[in-house]
From Swiss-Prot:
The gene is arsC. This is Arsenate reductase. One of its GO terms (biological process) is response to arsenic-containing substance. The active site is at residue 12. GO terms for molecular function: arsenate reductase (glutaredoxin) activity. NCBIfam families: arsC (TIGR00014).
Amino acid sequence: MPEIKIFHNPRCSKSRAALSLLEERGIAAEVVKYLDTPPDLSELKDIFNKLGLASARGMMRVKDDLYKELGLDNPNLDNDALLRAIADHPALLERPIVLANGKAAVGRPLENIEAVL
């Protein structure tokens, strides 16, 4: 069975739903409570690349107050600056994110996860 990892926040309903989806399918995933054990910059870059996004904002909680407080809505910021911000402030990481089969998906909507399983 391929290694599957979920970046999870137990306080988030979407994250809990994603974990339930994996469990219902009998998939034993490594659960990373990213607020307790945040990914480092290298891991964030890997996730970003696996997501295949044009902008790191696609893996950020752009509606979070912290995002605006830190000035991350500045269009001149590059992906490296955005990923460093997530590394420094893991609460900015969108959740859930599932890594499987060399790919990643943000589970909003949950159907996105299906594409990587």
